[in-house]
Amino acid sequence: MFHRRIVAPKDRDSLKRVTPAIGHLTDLVNHLKGRIGEAFVEALLRRANYSVSRVGREAHLPSLIKAGPTTYMPDFLAWREERNSGSSGSTQLFSIVAVEVKYRRQPERFLTDEAPKVFDEAGDHWPNFCVVLVTDNPEGGCSCFQVLRRDQTRRVECTDIANAGFDVYSTTAAMFSLLLKQVFHSLNEGVPAEGIGN
């Protein structure tokens, strides 16, 4: 026979202690937005016929227990076959991109303060490296997905994902942006307005 057991808290105040302080809640929500942003970027790349493999530090157990400095690891490696027809027949070539995904509510702060450091860390190890900056607060008619690359003069350039050479259609970027905003809006509902930042 099945018995249902109800467990009551020892005192009424114990439930109040479950709710984290605003700062901790904001950090948690921003972390969730970052992980959700990674999933959206992975889906966008797969939709553009890329194969995607997670290679970031979180994906490898040895890096979780290793002490000391480690080589920079992007979140994903994305690749797809590019047909190259020449005089000797078609050759199989692959376009490979190292992708780091960053969520920021205020993308302009990331561009000025953090992006150069990220590119300095990654540039030596990953020649075809880009950052996809995910935001729920895009400027003008831009999508929520901005691709950052460093040019020959070491200046960081920002381009909408629909114009970044990944073959992501602008309608797809707009559809994913709308969905992302709805998901992030739901997360924001749980955080008081003064706690939303980053």
Where are these regions (language model features)?
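Catalytic cores of nucleic-acid endonucleases
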Residues: 89-156
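Compositionally biased P/S/T/G-rich terminal and signal peptide-adjacent segments
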Residues: 2-9
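Conserved catalytic cores of phosphodiester-cleaving nucleases, focusing on short active-site segments
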Residues: 45, 75-85, 94-106
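Domain-level recognition of nuclease-like catalytic cores that cleave nucleotide substrates
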Residues: 128-198
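Acidic-basic catalytic patches of nuclease active cores, encompassing PD-(D/E)XK
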Residues: 9-68
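Beta-rich catalytic cores
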Residues: 72
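Intrinsically disordered, low-complexity Ser/Thr- and acidic-rich flexible linkers and loops
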Residues: 64-66, 84-91
